[in-house]
């Protein structure tokens, strides 16, 4: 997250760290969001090329805030199955969404909780909050503490003006400030973009891609969750 501030424990109870384990060490590489006790939502490009039926060495951590400290609130569960969207396009990042089936159930509390989905076809508006442990500048360092930043949503028309009409699909939603300086970045991928224009918080986007990070005139591009609600409900079973 570029231009963000530290979150506090329990502020984003739906945020997950999606990690790879290797020789006893765990490495954060993407974000994810809690859908229910047994499923998480992340980006397709975070899992592309993995063994979807029998993934090994993948885990999610819920209730995490500071990666360098054991807060006692963490819940770590391995990923038992990956459900990648059947129309995911790795080159164009169309339909950049996947589900992670967990090998056990999360226990919900003040620090670990699901995030609601919008109605299928809902158009999010206003300001949104994006969170993650990704780099705090383009090509920069990663923070220990979860970062948050608030940015306004950008219309599809404006985003197509910025990137080109052939780059922004209906399955995408854009957010950012015109002058740059606030954005998601490498390592935030798969994580949540939360909106609340309905009066309660819901998952509006999944961190997907962008031209660099926080560059003027190039908003962050996210998977539009309202485009995929029916798919999520049909596959998280």
UniProtKB/Swiss-Prot annotation:
SS bond partners: 30-46, 159-174, 185-213
Binding note for cofactor: Binds 1 Ca(2+) ion per subunit.
Annotated GO MF terms: metal ion binding; serine-type endopeptidase activity
Catalyzed reactions per annotation: Preferential cleavage: Arg-|-Xaa, Lys-|-Xaa
The EC number(s) this enzyme carries: 3.4.21.4
Location(s) in or outside the cell: Secreted, Extracellular space
Residues involved in Ca(2+) binding: 64, 69, 74
One CC-aspect GO term: extracellular region
Name of the top EC class for this enzyme: hydrolase
Site feature: Required for specificity: 183
Active site: 45 (charge relay system), 96 (charge relay system), 189 (charge relay system)
CDD domains on file: Tryp_SPc
Biological processes annotated in GO: digestion; proteolysis
Pfam family for this entry, one: Trypsin
Keywords, comma-separated and alphabetical: Calcium, Digestion, Disulfide bond, Hydrolase, Metal-binding, Protease, Secreted, Serine protease
Family designation: Belongs to the peptidase S1 family.
Miscellaneous: Trypsin I is one of five forms of the enzyme known to be present in crayfish. This protein is more acidic than mammalian trypsin.
Name of the protein described by the UniProt record: Trypsin-1
Organism: Astacus astacus (Noble crayfish)
């Amino acid at each position: 997250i570029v231009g963000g501030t530290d979150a506090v424990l329990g502020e984003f109870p739906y945020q997950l760290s999606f990690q790879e384990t290797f020789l006893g060490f765990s490495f954060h590489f993407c974000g994810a969001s809690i859908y229910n006790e047994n499923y998480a939502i992340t980006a397709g490009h975070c899992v592309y090329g993995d063994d979807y039926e029998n993934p090994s060495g993948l885990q999610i951590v819920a209730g995490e805030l500071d990666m360098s400290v054991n807060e006692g609130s963490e819940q770590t569960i391995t990923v038992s199955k990956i459900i990648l969207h059947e129309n995911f396009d790795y080159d164009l990042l169309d339909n950049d969404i996947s589900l992670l089936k967990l090998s056990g159930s999360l226990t919900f509390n003040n620090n670990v909780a699901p995030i609601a989905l919008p109605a299928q076809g809902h158009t999010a508006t206003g300001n949104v909050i994006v969170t993650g442990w990704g780099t705090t500048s383009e090509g920069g360092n990663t923070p220990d503490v979860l970062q948050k930043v608030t940015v306004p949503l950008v219309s599809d028309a404006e985003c197509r003006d910025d990137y080109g009409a052939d780059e922004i699909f209906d399955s995408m939603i854009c957010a950012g400030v015109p002058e740059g300086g606030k954005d998601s970045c490498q390592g935030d991928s798969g994580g949540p973009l939360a909106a609340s224009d309905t009066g309660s918080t819901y998952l509006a986007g999944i961190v997907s891609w962008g031209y660099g990070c926080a560059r003027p005139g190039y908003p962050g591009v996210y998977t539009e969750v309202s485009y995929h609600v029916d798919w999520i409900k049909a596959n998280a079973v």
